[in-house]
Regions:
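Phosphate- and other anionic-substrate recognition elements at nucleic-acid/protein interfaces
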Residues: 1-154
Length: 154
C-alpha cells in the first residue's frame, strides 16, 4: 500500500511511503503572486496535483490543523487556503484521506518533542534519506514522512 503524507502549508511537504520505505519526499510546490504591491506565496495546485497523481498513492494522511497562539488572521487564512487546495486535489483524484492530530502520529512513532525531534526520528526511520531532513527548515519534510509512515502502519 502506497501512502502519501502531507504537512500542509507553504513550508510543508509531501512524502510517499510504501510499507516501511520512504519512496520520495518533496517540498510543497509554491509560486509567488503580487498582491497589494506585496509578494505572496501560494500552493501551486497544478504541480501538487501532478506530484500526487504520479505518486500512485492509495490513501493520504494529513495533519489536522488548529489555531496556534499568536498566529495572526492572515496566517490562518493562508493555512486554510492551502488545506483547501490539498483537500480539493485529493478529492478530485479520489484518494481516501484521513486527518490526524499531531500528537497522535508523534506518540505512535515515538517522536521526541520539538521540530528537531521529528527531523531526528525521520532520519532514524529512513536512514537512506537522512540528508533530506538535515536542515532546520526541513521540518516539513520530516513531518510529511512521519505522517506517511503513520498512515502506512495503519
Amino acid at each position: 500500500m502506497r501512502v502519501i503524507g502531507i504537512d500542509v502549508g507553504l513550508n510543508g511537504a509531501i512524502a510517499i511511503v510504501e510499507g516501511d520505505q520512504l519512496i520520495e519526499v518533496h517540498d510543497m510546490p509554491t509560486f509567488t503572486v503580487e498582491r497589494n504591491a506585496k509578494n505572496k506565496r501560494m500552493v501551486n495546485a497544478a504541480e501538487l496535483a501532478r506530484l500526487i497523481r504520479q505518486s500512485a498513492a492509495t490513501s493520504a494522511y494529513l495533519e489536522r490543523l488548529s489555531a496556534m497562539p499568536g498566529q495572526g488572521v492572515t496566517s490562518m487564512f493562508s493555512m486554510g487556503q492551502s488545506l483547501g487546495v490539498v483537500l480539493g486535489i485529493l478529492a478530485a483524484l479520489d484518494i481516501p484521506t484521513t486527518t490526524i492530530p499531531p500528537r497522535t502520529w508523534q506518540k505512535a512513532l515515538d517522536v521526541p518533542q520539538g521540530k528537531d525531534g521529528s527531523r531526528y526520528r525521520a532520519a532514524q526511520l529512513f536512514p537512506a534519506h537522512a540528508a533530506k531532513f538535515a536542515r532546520v527548515k526541513d521540518d516539513g519534510r520530516s513531518d510529511a514522512a512521519l505522517i506517511a509512515a503513520y498512515g502506512a502502519s495503519r
